[in-house]
Every structure is written in structure tokens, then in C-alpha cells.
Design a protein with these regions (language model features):
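Active-site loop architecture of trypsin-fold serine endopeptidases
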Residues: 175-183
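N-terminal organellar transit peptides
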Residues: 1-159, 169-173, 185-310
Length: 310
């Protein structure tokens, strides 16, 4: 699956808590992540637009055309990098957006308020993102009063898989890229390049570990140990949450949590998903769950597409 866009060195530098350390002459970013690289982050307009609209106006029919509001399954895309808030300026990527946990939570909350919305489909195309952001979405899904289906399309990896694991069921294509359960915190060191270019790093710091991870200084074994400690803690929490969400033995999840991903067919065999299929499979699942006919299940237009019209 290395030819998939999400898999183009997804694990190089990724997105979790962005720690920005700045002085008048120094800016650097260190990133911890459950998956997707910063270079891969492309997403949608934030949902500020709908705050002045009624909840009903978020969910229009996608299958029948027009703005008639008779659809009963909300469709929420989770694409690109998952972060807590959308803040392109702080990421230094003006004009690009992420999948914001705050936005996803808001839309799920709105869907819960609308009586005619009987279920929620998460349409996942994501290599992952921030641990906390992924956890926030997952917890919201677990607490949802309406049934939730996660449909993994091209990819549902790492933090995005954590999100999917909280749904009532997970459906994926036989060719979907699934899993990649693990945590990464990597960066490109500039030390040798700086020496080659005649640049000297001047460290002014109070606090022994304040500059740990600065790419312009060498990383000691002791400092590496600090990072590995944190990675191991986050990894253990991720494995535990997925184990609980999927109702699978933690040892079974741990064996699968080596950072690798797998196609949907193997994910089904390993218990990471529940069924192979696409949107029509989702339709059939909701029809059975809600005691309706298949033709009575109508998917709403994805909420970001609605926002694009405003």
C-alpha cells in the first residue's frame, strides 16, 4: 500500500502537540503524532459558519438533490490531519486546514439534536493526527446516543483508527489501508548542516531539558530516553483505548500495534474492522439497526460540502 497518498512517508514528521519554542532569532517546531505528516495536511473550511444557523440546516439530502431536508443519516468526513483546533497561522500554513476535533464534536452534537437524524456515518480518509484530538473525537462518538458507523475509505490509520474504533461498527473496502497503531515523534536534525554552513548554535536556557528536541542541537541518550518514555506512555494508552473500544483482549491489540497497516481484508481477519464494503453496506447496516428498509436510509450531504455553499 506504499503508493497511497497517505502512506508517502506518513511517519516522517507528524502532528500531535505542537510545541513552539520561539525567541527573537529562533523558531522551531517539535511534533508528536499518531500518524499523518504535516506535509499531508489538507482539509476543509472550519465550521464557524454554522453557528448562526439552526441545527436543521446542517443536514441536507445528498441523494435526492436540492436542499430538501428529509435525510436521516448525517455524514461527517474525517480527512487529513486530526488536530484539536483549526489554527492555520500557528501552524505556519496559511490557507491550509486540518480536521479539527472541535469541529467534529460540534457537528456530532448538532446531529444529536435533530430528531430526523437517526444515525451518523463517519467517512474516514485519514492517516491520523494528534493523540488528544483523536481521543476527544473518539470519546464523543462513544457517548453518542445515536448509532455511529465508521466507513474507512482509502485510509483509517493511527489516530484516525482510534476514532473509528469508538464507532458501533467499522466498515472498510478490501483495499482500504487500516491500522498503523503506534506513535511517532521524529524530526530532521540540522546540527551537521549548520556546522557545514558555519552556523553556531547559542543556547540560552533556564531548565535542564527546556531545549530538548531542538533540531539545532544534538540529542543526548538521556534526552532520547525522555522522549521514548513519553512515546511509550501514549502508545500504551492508545492500545488500551482501542482494546476497550473494540472489546478485544489488550494483548491481541498489542500484537497488532507495531505501527504497520494492512488492507481491509487482513484487518477483517484480525478483528480491526467488522465488515467489508462501502456506503451501500453502511446503508444496509443502518436499515437493520433502525428496523427500516434500505430505501428508507437517506444519507445527508457531507457537512463540509454544505459549508462550501455558504
Amino acid at each position: 500500500m506504499s503508493d497511497l497518498p497517505y502512506k508517502e512517508k506518513i511517519h516522517l514528521v507528524s502532528t500531535y502537540s505542537l510545541w513552539r519554542k520561539m525567541t527573537s532569532s529562533l523558531k522551531w517546531i517539535l511534533v508528536i503524532a499518531l500518524g499523518v505528516g504535516i506535509g499531508n495536511i489538507i482539509s476543509f473550511p472550519a465550521l464557524d459558519w454554522y453557528s448562526n444557523n439552526q441545527s436543521q440546516n446542517l443536514f441536507f439530502n445528498s441523494e435526492l438533490g436540492g436542499n430538501n431536508a428529509t435525510c436521516n443519516i448525517a455524514v461527517i468526513p474525517i480527512d487529513s490531519g486530526i488536530v484539536t483546533v483549526t489554527d492555520e497561522e500557528s501552524l505556519g500554513m496559511k490557507g491550509n486546514f486540518n480536521t479539527s476535533a472541535d469541529d467534529i464534536v460540534d457537528v456530532i452534537t448538532e446531529a444529536e439534536k435533530v430528531d430526523r437524524i437517526e444515525g451518523i456515518m463517519l467517512r474516514i480518509d485519514s492517516g491520523g493526527g494528534a493523540p488528544v484530538a483523536s481521543e476527544i473525537i473518539a470519546e464523543t462518538i462513544k457517548n453518542a446516543k445515536k448509532p455511529v458507523v465508521a466507513l474507512i475509505r482509502e485510509a483509517g490509520n493511527s489516530g484516525a483508527y482510534l476514532v473509528a474504533s469508538a464507532a458501533n461498527t467499522i466498515i472498510a473496502s478490501p483495499m482500504s489501508d487500516v491500522g498503523s497503531i503506534g506513535v511517532t515523534m521524529s524530526y530532521l536534525a540540522n546540527v551537521e548542516e549548520n556546522v557545514k554552513n558555519g552556523k553556531q548554535f547559542v543556547e540560552l536556557v533556564a531548565g535542564k531539558y527546556k531545549e530538548v528536541g531542538n533540531p539545532d542541537r544534538p540529542l543526548s541518550n538521556e534526552e532520547r530516553g525522555l522522549f521514548q518514555r513519553d512515546l511509550n506512555i501514549i502508545y500504551s494508552q492508545m492500545v488500551e483505548k482501542i482494546s476497550k473500544n473494540r472489546k478485544m483482549p489488550i494483548e491481541q491489540i498489542r500484537q497488532l500495534a507495531d505501527g504497520s497497516s494492512m488492507p481491509g481484508t487482513l484487518a477483517l481477519k484480525n478483528g480491526l474492522i467488522d465488515e467489508l464494503g462501502g456506503q451501500e453496506t453502511v446503508r444496509a447496516w443502518f436499515a437493520k439497526k433502525l428496523d427500516l428498509e434500505n430505501n428508507e436510509i437517506e444519507f445527508c450531504k457531507p457537512v463540509w460540502s454544505v459549508s462550501d455553499k455558504e
